[in-house]
A protein has these predicted regions:
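Bacterial extracytoplasmic/cell-wall-associated proteins, especially those involved in peptidoglycan
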Residues: 10, 14-120
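Single conserved hydrophobic/aromatic residue that forms the stacking wall/gate
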Residues: 1-13
Length: 120
């Protein structure tokens, strides 16, 4: 996937990606945080998903912290430093996985395992 800088360049974008990273990978290793951010930007670049960070994150049924309200809470207070740094790096072009999906690893899906997640 080719990430277009015009799609991801704003401060709001960084804060939004950082909040999702904290919600989905707050207790994961830093590589896991980078991978979650990579999935978001890979989706933005894919024709199968909305073409904006906000569109991808708020797409119905995709990220459970959005549905539960946890994402809104983290976004309002600001993500932790590690998640914010990971978001900055991913937006800057450090895409660490070429995947569109991830989930908690229960051993049933083949993919790249990082921490407690599998990326596929």
């Amino acid at each position: 996937y080719e990430i277009m800088p015009s799609l991801v360049g704003s401060e709001m974008c960084k804060e939004t990606v950082a909040a999702l990273i904290e919600c989905e990978a707050g207790g994961e290793p830093y590589e896991g945080k980078l991978a979650v951010g990579s999935v978001v930007l890979n989706r933005v670049a894919s024709s199968h998903f909305p073409n904006s960070v906000v569109g991808v994150i708020y797409q119905s049924g995709q990220f459970s912290p959005v549905a539960s309200g946890r994402f809104a809470t983290v976004l309002a207070r600001g993500a932790d430093a590690s998640s914010t740094q990971a978001a900055q790096e991913v937006i800057g072009g450090r895409i660490t996985v070429k995947c569109l999906y991830f989930r908690r690893n229960n051993g049933t899906i083949q993919g790249t395992v990082i921490g407690n997640h599998v990326f596929y």
